[in-house]
Design a protein with these regions (language model features):
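Bacterial N-terminal signal peptides that target proteins for export
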Residues: 2-13
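Bacterial N-terminal signal peptides
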Residues: 11-24
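Accessory terminal and edge-of-domain segments that mediate assembly/interaction
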Residues: 31-384
Length: 384
């Protein structure tokens, strides 16, 4: 009798334990037990996830060549292949799907070329209810034209002063007054480089300078690839020593515009235009087509608490020079570059190498950097 009762009690206890375990497993391990399942079933485009995906770093690239993997690399490919950006997240409201490393929280995007696409892609991501971007750092990593007076192709440039090259008045040079040196001048002014200019309303954006300086100090000694063929391109620039240096890391101003311009005259304009709007606080070093659109969207998103504008960084690497070497015409040089940028491979490698130093530091010290933006000189990098 006692033995039978003991057996029944033991069986009952075992059944209760098994039921509890099954209940617990049912509650803790849903059918969609992977991030991929969650994205596919619970995070459809245009809808909110049951729990937003927390992003630590948004990697902003502008274009890719061909496929995202396995062929000639544009701006996105090396990041996707080397940083485990393997989880595709459909993003039909923009130019290109997103790719996430669910283990690190690094999200890669390709905005498309030009300020219009970069602004709308950034806004689309910032307002996407699937993501929590409130503590995310943004790293723009793109190729650029580079001023031979400042650096060489393959060099990587951190920028905080972003000047727009589109907003303005313009008169054809053949119709401008004889005492003008250019037909392009600021809106609401009377002549080129009029000192009585209005406050910028899209002509100039300034990112977190302290964060820019922190990123530069962290990466300034990063060895950059000096690939075969670069020296031959550099050596043609006999009148500008920085253009002949092997690739290096520096800081400098950035000019963004929808027109791919080239030549000595426009290069001089770019230098004066950046100096004019920054009032001498920065010089022109790189030229591309997106930053003022991207950061305009960031500023709007910051106003509603979707992102933090102070966590935005710009890194550009020179794929080509913004003017030809001595003895070569502007049209001839531009058309040659259109056949393939001399520094494309070196520039995307430099972007990856330099940008990865910053990304690795942020991830390694996330417990700190989630709440404290680096840039305070009293903050020692976790890697030291």
């Amino acid at each position: 009798m006692h033995r039978t009762l003991s057996v029944r009690v033991a069986v009952l206890v075992a059944l209760l334990v098994m039921a509890a375990l099954l209940t617990g497993l049912a509650g803790c391990t849903p059918a969609r037990d992977s991030m991929a399942d969650v994205v596919e079933q619970d995070c459809l485009p245009g809808t909110a996830c049951s729990k937003p995906i927390e992003i630590r770093i948004v990697l902003v690239t502008m274009f890719e060549i061909g496929e995202d993997e396995g062929d000639t690399a544009g701006e996105f490919q090396l990041w996707k292949e080397r940083r485990g950006l393997s989880l595709r997240i459909p993003f039909p409201q923009s130019h290109h799907d997103l790719y996430l490393n669910p283990d690190t929280g690094v999200l890669g995007m390709v905005t498309g070329i030009g300020t219009a696409k970069s602004a709308t892609a950034t806004m689309a991501l910032g307002l996407d209810p699937r993501f929590d971007l409130r503590k995310a750092y943004w790293l723009v990593a793109g190729i650029a034209g580079i001023d031979p007076a400042d650096a060489s192709i393959g060099s990587a440039v951190w920028s905080a002063h972003l000047v727009d090259g589109d907003l303005g008045h313009e008169i054809d040079a053949r119709e401008m007054p004889k005492d003008w040196e250019t037909g392009y001048f600021a809106r609401y002014t009377r002549f080129p480089y009029d000192p009585d200019k209005p406050e910028p309303t899209g002509e100039l954006f300034v990112t977190n300078i302290a964060l820019r300086d922190w990123a530069f100090e962290l990466t300034r000694n990063t060895p950059l690839p000096d690939l075969p063929g670069l020296a031959a391109s550099r050596d043609k620039y006999t009148e500008t020593e920085p253009a002949r240096r092997p690739p290096f890391v520096l800081v400098g101003g950035h000019l963004a515009g929808m027109t791919f311009w080239h030549g000595e005259i426009l290069n001089e304009w770019a230098n004066r235009w950046v100096d004019y709007w920054t009032e001498g606080q920065s010089d022109f070093v790189t030229s591309a087509m997106e930053e003022t659109g991207t950061f305009q969207a960031i500023e709007y998103l910051d106003r509603v608490g979707r992102v933090d504008r102070d966590r935005f960084m710009v890194l550009r690497a020179g794929s080509n020079y913004t003017m030809p070497p001595p003895g070569v015409g502007a049209a001839e040089n531009l058309l040659a570059e259109n056949e393939g940028y001399a520094g494309l491979q070196a520039s995307v490698e430099s972007l990856y190498l330099v940008g990865s130093v910053v990304i690795d530091e942020l991830l390694r010290g996330w417990e700190r950097y989630a709440d404290v933006i680096p840039g305070d000189s009293r903050i020692t990098p976790v890697s030291e």
